[in-house]
Amino acid sequence: MNFWLQEQAQSNGNRLAIVTNQLSLTYEELYHRAKTIAEYLTSLNQKRIGLYISNDIDSVVLIHACWLAHIEIAMINTRLTRHEMINQMNSVDIATIVHTLPLELEGFNLYHFNDLTQLDKHDVSGYKFNLESIASIMFTSGTTGPQKAVPQTFNNHLASAKGCKQSLGFEQNTVWLSVLPIYHISGLSVILRAVIEGFTVRLVKKFQTDDMLTQIKTYPITHMSLVPQTLKWLMDAGLTQPFSLEKILLGGAKLSPQLIEQALTYRLPVYNSFGMTETCSQFLTASPQMLKERFDTVGKPSENVEVKIKNPNAYGHGELLIKGENVMNGYLYPKYLKDTFDNDGYFQTGDIAEIDDEGYVIIYDRRKDLIISGGENIYPYQIETIAKDFEGIEDAVCVGISDDTWGQVPILYYVTNQDINQTELIEHFENHLARYKIPKKYYQVKSLPYTSTGKLQRKKVKSEDLNEGKNNES
């Protein structure tokens, strides 16, 4: 079969494929550029290369060129240290890295995108497209152990795109505003959905509130992918009506009830979702109607996806397991990980969840973020939600710290520009939580660490000294 991009060039050649503030390409133009670069890439004689790229047109051309040349791509997070990059690339036997951003990294063959045309050309027109071959390799955070390399096949991506279309909905007239980095699955999946369906992606290099608002107001944007914090920034800056937006896909972090209520008040078409690198993006999606019925749900599984709860406790809480064609076959590195799949072939996500009587899935926390205090499970998100409901608290995060008596106890960092009465805050928790769940220490801080795309860096909260403000113990 032909590659998706070639099929779109033949059937929808004049349709816009990629648009930025500087440039735009139709599907025919994108295909011809990618095919030309693919002919140069074959001279590298590499089965697999690393990509150090950005949200720009050259990077999208490069991705498709690699696939046309039958080259697997290992995506490099541009925020990593040199040491982290080297370890990742070595773990999956990468010798060559192609980059669209400035890069100096010892021990690898480096080629800037603009220099590829100095290589010899070889014809790629006879190459056949195999759905079962590896398309991309991404790395999980490695916070609970070794860095994990996730191989994603074209069929995994196709199944994910089909599931997204079924649960969210998109068509050839869709215009998807995408600011999430394409080296992450949330960003790359938009590029793949587009080339499979034939819609237009409006690509944004970096999240800037004013620029995003201008694009939403100016262009016929129908779809947009965000994390909850960036939606909050947009609403605070003036996104108080949907304009042409039909779907706002949220993921990557918990949705607070306050944010949902505000978004629905503005009639914003918010869809909460849940997915992983290992599942090629979302496999659970909650529509606005579902969120009205149950604000804390991530919805129901996509078509052809099965989910279940492993060893549920008395409350129905247990580890979420998933099975489907969107799920990877196993890690490339480390190759032999225990407890990746159960005996029935379900992938074990490491997330604590519940499936209610209506079939809605509720994610409580990552298993690694769970606080176990005196044998009791404490979900940080529950504490954070109640904290944000206290007047004057703008943001909050709960983490566990070691305790000689209980093993772990919860503490709270919160952001406010008001004078918070600590006694009243503790009383607020006492009215809503069992005593063992109430934070034992409180830190008022100026801000919490977020990535440029608005995702809370919980790992930094645990490792860095944020205690720049008031400290009180309960």
Swiss-Prot record:
What keyword terms does UniProt attach to this protein?
ATP-binding, Ligase, Menaquinone biosynthesis, Nucleotide-binding
Q: Which SUPFAM superfamilies match?
A: Acetyl-CoA synthetase-like
Pfam families (UniProt xref): AMP-binding, AMP-binding_C
**Enzyme's top EC category:** ligase
| Pathway participation | Quinol/quinone metabolism; 1,4-dihydroxy-2-naphthoate biosynthesis; 1,4-dihydroxy-2-naphthoate from chorismate: step 5/7; Quinol/quinone metabolism; menaquinone biosynthesis
The biological process GO terms on file are: fatty acid metabolic process; menaquinone biosynthetic process
Example of a GO MF term: o-succinylbenzoate-CoA ligase activity
Q: Which Gene3D superfamilies match?
A: 3.30.300.30, N-terminal domain of ligase-like
Q: Does the keyword Nucleotide-binding apply?
A: yes
**Catalysis performed (reactions):** 2-succinylbenzoate + ATP + CoA = 2-succinylbenzoyl-CoA + AMP + diphosphate
Q: What is its EC number?
A: 6.2.1.26
Per the record's keyword annotation, is Ion transport included, yes or no?
A: no
Recorded superkingdom:
Bacteria
Q: Which family does it belong to?
A: Belongs to the ATP-dependent AMP-binding enzyme family. MenE subfamily.
Task performed by this protein: Converts 2-succinylbenzoate (OSB) to 2-succinylbenzoyl-CoA (OSB-CoA).
Q: Identify the HAMAP family for this entry.
A: MenE
Q: What is this protein called?
A: 2-succinylbenzoate--CoA ligase
The encoding gene is menE
